[in-house]
Amino acid sequence: MKKTYMQSTEEVLQGLDTTAGGLTTQEAEKRLEKYGPNKLKEAEKISMFRRFLNQLKDPMLIILMIAAAVSAATTVIDFMQLPQPRDIGHLTEGLVEVGIILVVVLLNAILGVIQESKAEAAIEALQTMTAAKCKVLRDGKMVMLHSTELVPGDVVILEAGDAVPADGRIIENASMKIEEAALTGESVPVNKLIDALNLTAGQEDVPLGDRKNMCYMGSTVVYGRGKAVITETGMATEMGKIADALAQTEEEETPLQKRLDQLGKILSYLVLGICVFIFAFNLLMKGDFTLGGILGTFMVAVSLAVAAIPEGLATVVTVVLSIGVTKMSKRNAVIRRLTAVETLGCTQVICSDKTGTLTQNKMTVVESYGDENLVASAMALCSDANLNEEDQAEGEPTECALVNFACKLGMKKQDLEAKTPRVDEAPFDSGRKMMSTVHAVDGAYVQYTKGGPDVVLARCTACLENGQIVPMTEEKRAQIMAANKAMADKALRVLAVAQRTWSEKPADNTPEFLEQELVFLGLAGMIDPVRPEVKAAIEECRGAGIRPVMITGDHKDTAVAIAKELGIIEDASQAITGAELDKISDEDLPEFVKKYGVYARVQPEHKVRIVAAWKLNECITAMTGDGVNDAPSIKTADIGVGMGITGTDVTKNVADMVLADDNFATIVSAVGEGRRIYDNIRKAIQFLLASNMSEVLGVFGATLLGFTLLNPVHLLFINLVTDCFPALALGMEEAEADTMTRPPRNSKDGIFAGGLGFDVVYQGILVTVITVAAYLIGASFEFGADWFAKLREAGTSDHGMSMAFLTMSMCEIFHSFNMRSQRKSVFTLKSQNKILWLAMIGSLLLTTAVLEIPFLCTAFGFAHIGWTEYGIAMGLAITVIPVVEFVKLIQRAIAKK
């Protein structure tokens, strides 16, 4: 069966079992039951509680909750074993660490819920774009109905300003133009017609933007009027297909999520293995299989679990991302999904829509031929666009460009019309591609005719040359067409204007009577100009190893011209159309996309295919756009970038990031910020894991030697207080000098890539050695002669614990200074991180407070230490800086080789 746009109006009406007068009310009610209301499906709403539970699926949080549960259980069991009367303080002290862990879990979950993207907002935004009311023919009469009541077979009346309520076939047309940019990406409104369309040779389908006898839900009538018979409603419309594609596109994890999930799994296996080993080792070594002995051994294992898990990591990552989001929003990049920030940092391809993204979405006259003032005034008068009170042109975009052209030359449309009022016209018709207006001037009449250069020139018998009317010769005709071709080669849309003078008002206003024996005045070439800042932004993208790609619904010539101007491509061989794309299989497409930088005349499904092909090439892909047509591909991309000003609500709600200023250059800033944030998160991760490594090795080694280095609550304090503040401060480091001159990182690189794993291990060992040394010195101060034997016998030393706690805290505080750069010497960094200095001082004061405030010292089980011990701890801890600086020096030397 022939497609609707290939059928005549009679065939379409017959196929839908309707007439040009519309359906009867009774028949419409039957069809409403059959097809359902003309609206888009609503997405399933996710409750706040369900969103909260989804946050708790994070592996890191699961490990923390298990650790909290085990700690709580052992504390309660241990408390129940105490003789009566039991000391409630023992229970409270044991549950402190449980409470701290649960607060961390709760905080992360709440932050996740607040930041989480609301998927159903996309469908709701699509619904708001559909017309609320529409004019429908029912029982042969025009009635106003809610758009949801429309059914296939209904005949709707469309006028300028109306939103098209459903997909339809045009059956009556009076110079109607429909703006379809949101669906097709083409900025110029489409001149509609009623004739059936035919396929050209080798064509299997007519692209959406070329179906001139069709109209689609979500588009807007900008000129003329007409009637259309509804062919599809609701989810069967083109808009509905987009909504359905959005619903079917599955969410993928960002690289950071994958890395943190991987880290969570590694830590869970590590914790399980170490805990089982220590539990078994202690039981066998001590030979104490009583409940008390088992619980004591179990608490040692819990200590190791607490030591192994960086409790502050999830919070630090979330807060660093949140701070980055705030900073980006101040630069007009609004992040809608928290973990998507770092995805920008490894973006390798940016697929960008043209209209409104790379260009201004504002047709502008950029070149003219002939007397510029006369051409401008004539074209402004021969148009239906007008200037509002703010001198902004309103109307069809092409005519707005002509009115603005005259205005820039000092000729306002209203002033021109006051001097030469319009008295008659022959409206534009897509068949003849012209329009004419007749104006009264000084007791006579002048007619202006504008349209396509070929059709206007064919009706000219003379031309204006140096203010004189001279006969049109073949030589002059060739000159005019050469000027037209020169403009067209630049992808300009060219219009011609001519005039005819009358001593009396023409008796006939038919085109056949008016549009002959014309005097050619000139040409005007217009284009949707590029945004002035985009070219520099694209150069910066290339410098950062990112490939920009243009994907548009516009014509190939226009797209190529814009892309060449911006530096996206070098020649037309790097451009391909949607029709040509259809001939390439999904299997071959990933290889083909590498060849092209411009995709023209594409439809929504093409955009999704292109983005998917780049992803199959293992390239982290971003997609920018503003129209509804961009929404599925934006959601398919690793990171979708919507436009805040010109963007539709559906695009903004699907996007991971929205550019508040619609500025392509903001993407470059966002990419740099994404790289900075990821670099800083790696610094924080390295710092926290090195700290945890030192705790694990210290507790593990001390257990093997027969004494307790630190208790779980001590480790939690270090992890959540001493470490967290410097880690957060590291997340606020300024970008390093090479941030935007190095290639994007490989998204497959693990969290320990680039030598981070080695750094964590050696730095963890370094802090362990320093901490154990401090513990042993403290124990020797407590036990005096033969201190090691006494320590083994006692199994612990309050003095040693105090020294270990102080030294480990100081060591990690000083180590945070090292972490300002993974490879560069911190003494060569030009920027100053004042927040880090404050964090280091704050952590040091809090650590000292625990040791010096009596009730805290008692609660933590510490002994009072003097200035000598403080001096020893400081001397030991500060050695971490020169040692790490020396290793960095060696690493830089190796890297150069």
Feature map (PLM): residue ranges:
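Core segments of transmembrane alpha-helices
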Residues: S694-E695, D759-T771
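A C-terminal functional module that forms or caps the active site or interfaces directly
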Residues: M819
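Conserved cytosolic headpiece of P-type ATPases
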Residues: M1-P744, D749-F752, I765, F805, ...
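Helix-coil boundary and interhelical linker segments in multi-pass alpha-helical membrane proteins
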Residues: T703-N711, I777-H799
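Generic alpha-helical transmembrane segments
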Residues: T722, H799-S816
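Membrane-helix interface motif
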Residues: F79-M80, V772-W787, E852-C857
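Membrane-water interface at loop-to-transmembrane-helix junctions
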Residues: N746-I765, L791-M803
